[in-house]
Amino acid sequence: MSIFSKATYFFFIAFFTISISAEYKLGRDYKLIDNPLPVKKDGVVEVTESFWYGCYACYSFEPAINSWAAKQDADIKFKKMPVSWGPIHKLHARLYYIIESLKLDPSTHSAVFVTMHKEGNMLQRESSVKDFLSKFDVAPEITEKYLKSFTINQKINRDAKQAKQMMLT
């Protein structure tokens, strides 16, 4: 091993050791939100993942978060919350809630990510969402009904309010 290789190796070990052992400091590494979400008194911790199907980092992180969530005990409640910042985000949030409302197999969410990030179909129109869901035996008229659903609109509005409260950008 050359002296350069040894020096590089030492640098990375030292850097990552310092990074791992560093303590997080309020104001530097994180900040408290003005209106924290209420903490339940039953001892159950709620972990919320905010995501967007079109986000490559979310796609990359999906297997790890699903694996982590599957290993949690009953004292951890894991939920996903699609972001709805703009029109395309809202369409994808509707897609998320359609999949949930119809109780489609959870692997359908992974199929959305694959369709977008591997196949290049970003599902940017209601018609492409209908075509996508038809692969899972959902009739286009059912998808249309759910795309316009009052209940799904309520969920998206609730999520937008919660995202604002959590200061997600």
Residue ranges and their predicted role:
Residues 8-9, 20, 47-50, 92, ...:
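Functionally constrained cores in energy, signaling, and assembly domains
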Residues 15-20, 120-124, 132-137:
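Short, exposed beta-strand "edge-strand" segments with a Pro/Gly-rich flavor and a Y/T-containing core
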Residues 48, 53-132:
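Structural alpha/beta surface segment adjacent to cysteine/selenocysteine redox centers
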